[in-house]
Amino acid sequence: MPTKGDYQPPKDGILSKLPESAVPYGELLRIHRPLGYYLNISPYVVGVAYTAAISPVTLPSTFLLGRLVILSLWGFCIRSAGCAWNDLIDMDIDRQVSRTKLRPLPRGAVSPSGAALLAAFMFGCGGSLLLLLPSQCAFEAAIVVFFALLYPFGKRFSDHPQLILTNIAWAIPMAMSSLDMSPLDFPIPTLAMSFSIASVIVMIDIVYACQDAEEDKKVGARSMAVRYMEITDQIAYGLFFSGTLSLLVGGILRGLGFPFLIFSVGGHFLGFLRFLRASLGKGAKSALVESQAKSSCLLATMLLVFGLCFEYCVRL
């Protein structure tokens, strides 16, 4: 069992700026791991930009910005709550995996009750933001929260827990609802855009999970990285190409033009192709996976949103 003596306090980064007593809680919320926050918040940014680009009426920029802030805060709260909840449920598994055995709960720096209270608080903060959004958003939010609570149990009962993470793709219909547009008005484009987001999330998580695949197999933790260890590359590329195609379909069906095709689809393709080429085949313990994911995802999303914003401006 890991002990506090095995743990080295952070000497740099955001955690080093916190009071010593607050560091374990910052670690529990993963505030030092921006990739997870990016993956939870960026779909809402894409959702707002996509809705603005396809809306039959011109949506005021101030209205769009206001909704973007609320949805981004929602994504931040749900990501934080999900991390605390996941670590609480996974505490027994985390103790047995080298990469996770020194997390706050396994090493005893945070009590289970403390983690539960923190998770409940962050879920509550997220829930309070729904008061600022149309009532329809509560339905999409409930789906997101349900699957966030379910996720840590997935690796115990299924070889495909990554599929639970597709709940993040509900950011697209939730963003549309927040802007007073029903996702059912454009069901196929909405589904295509949501599938594109879901494909990216699952792709990145599978590649990231390869770091722990061997140890997960030994301790009985199940995942797609463990189940399909021999064909991880093929699955990742399959998700990449299907996600790119879905993005293309989602734009074409709503009449988006060359700015979308060149910047949004092109940026998605180049950004995530860069990620896969840099991350796959580097070995299960590759230190490049997270850094490549951060830079590649940022590049892909910036170009995707730029293309959608270009389409919005053209329609003004």
Swiss-Prot record:
It is found in: Membrane. Belongs to the UbiA prenyltransferase family. Pathway: Secondary metabolite biosynthesis; terpenoid biosynthesis. It catalyses: 3,5-dimethylorsellinate + (2E,6E)-farnesyl diphosphate = (3R)-3-farnesyl-6-hydroxy-2,3,5-trimethyl-4-oxocyclohexa-1,5-diene-1-carboxylate + diphosphate + H(+). Its cofactor is Mg(2+). The lineage of its organism: Eukaryota, Fungi, Dikarya, Ascomycota, Pezizomycotina. Gene3D superfamilies: UbiA prenyltransferase. This is Polyprenyl transferase prhE. Polyprenyl transferase; part of the gene cluster that mediates the biosynthesis of paraherquonin, a meroterpenoid with a unique, highly congested hexacyclic molecular architecture. The first step of the pathway is the synthesis of 3,5-dimethylorsellinic acid (DMOA) by the polyketide synthase prhL. GO terms for cellular component: mitochondrial inner membrane. Its main location: membrane. Its EC number is 2.5.1.-. PROSITE patterns: UBIA. Keywords: Magnesium, Membrane, Transferase, Transmembrane, Transmembrane helix.
